Amino acid sequence: MTNGQSPAGLRGEHMRDRVITRKEEALYLAATTREPLASVAVVLADTGMRPEESFRLRWESITWVNGRYGVLFVTRGKTAAARRPIPMTSRVRAVLESRWHAASKPAEGWVWPAPTRSGHIEPSSIRKQHEAALAATPVTPFVTYSFRRTFLTRLAESGADPWTLARVAGHSSTAVSSRYVHPSDDALQNAIERLGGHKIGHSEDEQEEAARQLLLTE
């Protein structure tokens, strides 16, 4: 036991915090050929939604006309910030539109209906498919929540400001969002290089020009 947590609990927490590389994501998605995980995984990877938020997604909460590829709305949450619009990427639209057409274009209802008490998929609905996808690839195991942390980390690395990050994540404050960001080594290196590109201080040419101007004024 460590700080009141079992080793298994700590391992689960570590997997939850893990940021998935783009190569790992590609391998995993290629291995997820069965529904509902095939479409759920894409939505999680490209929206940063909490898994339970995606499970509760309804057709009436999706619009195909707003934004570049459409927008989906999270209509339930513990806070007002959790209820938010999320722009769709092209591949999110592709998988959701495919399901919509396959379901005869319903105006309402669960996107992923299931024979559960809630009427929609639950963690148990995709657990075996998730485990099978991991087993079929060399990817280090992770939990589906890792997609959220990965999405938010990538969004931060792309230059999104803290307020945008919090809004997309559904966080009530930027302080909460900061806990989800784990810059990669490459991102840190790129940030330092960008900083160097701003030429903080003065280059030798700039210093020589300044000295020349000073002599002219004397």
Q: What kind of feature is each model-predicted range?
A:
Residues E25, P36-A38, P123, R127, ...:
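Short, leucine-enriched amphipathic alpha-helices that occur as contiguous helical runs
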Residues R22-K23, T89-T140:
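Active-site/catalytic core of tyrosine-dependent DNA strand-transfer enzymes
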Residues D17-T21, T32-T33, V43, E122, ...:
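Residue-level marker of regulatory loop/turn positions in helix-turn-helix DNA-binding domains and
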Residues T2-G9, R18, R22-L27, T47, ...:
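Conserved tyrosine-mediated DNA breakage-rejoining catalytic core shared by Y-recombinases
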Residues V19, R76-A81, P162, A169-R194:
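Catalytic-site neighborhood detector that most strongly recognizes the C-terminal catalytic loop/helix
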